[in-house]
Amino acid sequence: NKIEFQKNYGWPKASYGEPYGQKKGQPIFFKEHKKNGFQEPLFAFSKAVGISELIHISNNFSSFWIDNFLISSLWGQSIYRMKFDENFERTIFFEKIYIGQRIRDIKYHNKLNAVLLALEETGEIGIITNK
């Protein structure tokens, strides 16, 4: 979501994800945000993908990726490319890019014009370029 002043997004009481590591007697998540007085998410992964980071990709990276965001994931072992409308009110593009490893971190490197991935299992650095 685009964070707005004095909006309540429900954390930690509301989520479309599933609780894990929950102790007996702890309340479960509210699944309906609006009904419980919380701001609805702009986009939700249902089944959770284990988001590790979200970055805005430089418009210099590719003419096809203008104003795009990349979301790295642990459980999903993928990068998710998203684009929102100009007011950040709806998703207008979504693409899953399968990597095959848990992605611990993702960064855009200006000088290399590349996306760098910290891959968990091998400890390698993945590099995505537009070439």
Regions found by a protein language model. Give the residues of each.
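Beta-propeller domain segments
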Residues: N1-I92, K111, E124, I128-K131
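Beta-rich catalytic cores
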Residues: G50, R102, E121
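Residue position within the beta-strands of beta-propeller blades
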Residues: I71, L116-A118
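Conserved blade-ending motifs and adjacent loop-strand segments that build the rim/top face
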Residues: E89-N110
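C-terminal amphipathic alpha-helical "assembly" element
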Residues: I106, N113-L116, I125-G126
